[in-house]
Amino acid sequence: MSRERTLIRLPAAVLGLAGVVMTPGVHAATVISEALYDAAGTDNGNVFVELYGTPGTALDGVSLEGINGSDGSVYLTLPLSGVIPGDGVFVVADDAGDGSSLVDNADLVVNMDFQNGPDSIVLRDAAGILDALGYGDFSGGVFAGEGNAAPDAPAGSSLARADPLADSGDNLSDFTVLDTPTPGSVPVSSVPLPPALALFLSGMGGLLAVSRRRAGLAV
């Protein structure tokens, strides 16, 4: 069953107003948040894997792997690079053949060809597996995802986390089929609040509270 997500992508200008300074961080909180591995028509330049993580996290040393569901072998390895932007969303998109991609909001363009299910996509760094998504019917196959497999999305549809902040360790529970893929967007409730902005808003709230108390005393 397909479900809709209420989505938002924060412009960099908004984050800039908060005086945010991004610095490289660890990879532990980075997860696979959406994957379109079978586009309607040609896959060339149209498929993607979206990651969600802490803004400012450097992805050097992180890779995506395609795991064959028939024998568990690694058939594709994609070394990643770049830094997760201020909205926490990083889109790894397929190369259309000229160094560009047809995927919206692409942050990194690579030659990508993930197979249809049953297969798995694994996100890892030097320390081990960060996240994994298995999709399709693994009866008699090798499952490299988490918990129970997500369904095999039909052509043109993606698999997406209903909430990128929630990782129960079960692909079937965490992922849903989206009829309309949403690369570069996440549910509004999941947009991370930069620390500087959170501090600013907290301070403003305190000032307003003091002003109200003083106004009450003056009456």
What are the functions of these language-model segments?
Residues 168-190:
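A recurrent domain-boundary module in secreted/ectodomain proteins
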Residues 16, 26-27:
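Cleavable N-terminal signal peptides
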Residues 2-12:
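Bacterial N-terminal signal peptides that target proteins for export
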Residues 192-210:
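A short, hydrophobic C-terminal helix/tail in secreted or cell-surface proteins
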Residues 208-219:
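C-terminal membrane-anchoring or membrane-association module
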